[in-house]
Amino acid sequence: RICSVDEKNEILYVPAVSICRLIDNKGNLKAKYAEMVLHQMWCVANLRIRSVEVQGDSAAIRFHQPESRIQFEHPWPRPMVTTNGHNSAFYLTNARELQDVPGEWYHDIDARKVYYYPREGEKMQEAEVIVPAVETLVRVEGTLDRPACHIRFEKITFSYTTWMRPSEKGHVPLQAGMYLTDGYRLDPK
């Protein structure tokens, strides 16, 4: 769980032990595409990690833009820090250094390789591997004058799409999976 939040400087503090696999012996971030998945009340944010600074038993995590600004500007849902230990939960992802459980995989964008930790008894020579490359399979568009209506899909299966936005621009949601493209305040400065 997170330890504290510094909204002004756009920093989340987490236990240092939770990020030890992402930093080298000098404290530098070695997993340049690492992400934090942050549970905050009724939605989950995906935040690309820009830097980590260990400070004793905690670590200050800063995030890439635009999601850092959006995350710390919008009024809710906020990362929770409570007096009874029910702070927002998080986990780290998108780093080869985090692979420690069979079935996990990591896509190294720079090397153009996928690293996979096989499950017991799994033979990669016999595995069916599918790499989704398309985000949109069907697009239905309309206007007020020409609305899209009376559309039905029957006996069709849509499979194997991808959604790369969180890894490319972060994902700061509001509600029902809707993501914010900009921050806002209830009391503008």
Predicted regions and their residues:
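Extracellular polysaccharide-degrading/modifying enzymes targeting complex plant/algal/animal polysaccharides
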Residues: 1-189
